[in-house]
């Protein structure tokens, strides 16, 4: 099929730390009656399954998107979404591509550091401009100092087209301000700033998610 990625949003209900659980232990848990697992046991089974998902995603060249940081709504365990808890996965699966969402807010520093340290970690700043415009501006400026600019994406992560359009305006406003200030400080040429912006809003995603190849296959099927 022409799937372009897989996504994990489990930070809403559990920690992002996924232990490496053996097949034998996971099998014993899986065959237990439904509802009989403790919270710790259920986590172990989830851990095993997500490792399996990463392995399959890697086989099929599908990037793995992961919700990090701030959780929508009220009353949750914010610490669940701490980006650095994913560190063991980045070490274990160097061939996988991981795309971290939302700037990892409020842990934007470790979010950026992970992308700097690991070649297979990419950053999608989706939501960050809406959460805090000023945080988005300052964090993106820091990230551009230390992370290659072909590792950035912008996504809407919205349910309605109106929300997507509004989210795009927020994102463009933040990126334009950051790049303009970097031009004024002599850190970028205008041509390079346009290249960075095109990458963030279009070209980087096309390359990383292999959209040209997969969309062309869809069009071919439509002609048949």
Regions found by a protein language model. Give the residues of each.
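Short active-site-adjacent structural elements
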Residues: 161-165
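Alpha-helix capping and helix-loop boundary segments enriched in small/acidic/polar residues
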Residues: 76-77, 131, 166, 192
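Mid-to-C-terminal alpha-helical segments outside catalytic/metal-binding sites
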Residues: 149-150, 166-224
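His/Asp/Glu-enriched short active-site or ligand-binding loop at hydrolase and phosphoryl-transfer sites
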Residues: 122-133
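Intrinsically disordered, low-complexity polar regions and short flexible loop motifs
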Residues: 157
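Glycine-/small-residue-rich active-site loops that bind phosphorylated ligands and cofactors
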Residues: 106, 131, 160
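Short glycine-rich, flexible loops that bind phosphorylated cofactors or substrates
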Residues: 14-15, 130
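Histidine/acidic residue-rich metal-binding segments in metalloenzymes
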Residues: 1-8, 15-121, 135-153, 170-171, ...
